[in-house]
């Protein structure tokens, strides 16, 4: 399924063959590609990120566009299916002739696309893929979020400091690069700080029954459970843990960030914690302005994926303006030089490895609502 979203009223160009990164002709709309999980098991991620990107592009066009030209956002749905991201990104580059790519949320899907973007010298910005391997692909690959070595270390210290846990169990999705990586970084920091990881139970994304793993965790005597997975499994894990009488704290990373988490987990989510990139409760004028505009447009409160999607579009637009055109190498150089760009998820500075230096936000579930706990800065 593909959705082409044009904001300029221009006639769409016929399909083209071949690849390359020549700048868009002056006066024509600037074509920007986006790939996201708009359908399938992780659709909440893709839909939130897409809405944020859509809002940003709409605002940019209303303000006159970029370099005096409108932006045309061409969005492809990878259906949450492994392998599909590579297919749609090839299409965006070869047929649609986009000058840059925004996406994806999931690290495994960004990793599918990154070699293709790198080979074709098309800058790619991931809004929220936190696995460090994503940007290691090459110098055309960027992100506007923190990375998992930082997230894992902060989560480990949170377990010690706030949860008072000295012995933990891990529940890891072995089919997810994000989950495996975040588990590793958590484990390294937690054990370095004197804690014990009593056992690591494993599952595959899409599993529905976690009772065997949770029974083993219960028998281990773990004082907390770290589940670095996506919201689709996190909610079920919490439900089944409580059904088995496990009352210890359960916590996770930014993969938990979705309104559907509470819909899936219900009352079992009470008292759980997760790390993320921003909070809609932030009182800063920039955040509250974004929240108000997002609610007016989509009739819902924007989550972190929406905020990062929004920021990724603005970071790209800023780089194009500083580059003075849409040529791939020049936009790449401008992205690499991004410093203190003010967005709704904080100030974005791109480091030498094309990662963003950003703070981390902790959220909890209280009375069936997501509530802000604290912000930890690098």
Ranges and model annotations:
Residues 141-205, 224, 316:
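An alpha-beta-alpha
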Residues 1-31, 62, 377-378:
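Short, low-complexity disordered leader/linker segments with a strong preference
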Residues 117, 182-275:
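Extracellular/periplasmic bilobed ligand-binding domains
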Residues 24-52, 76-83, 105-106, 171-180, ...:
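Extracytoplasmic "Venus flytrap"
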Residues 238-310, 324, 364-377:
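Extracellular/periplasmic periplasmic-binding protein-like sensory domains
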Residues 15-20, 44-51, 63-135, 203-210, ...:
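Beta-alpha junction/loop-to-helix N-cap segments that form part of ligand/metal-binding clefts
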Residues 296-306, 317-370:
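Segments of small-molecule ligand-sensing domains
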Residues 85, 144-167, 180-182, 208-211, ...:
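Hydrophobic alpha-helical segments within soluble ligand-binding/sensing domains
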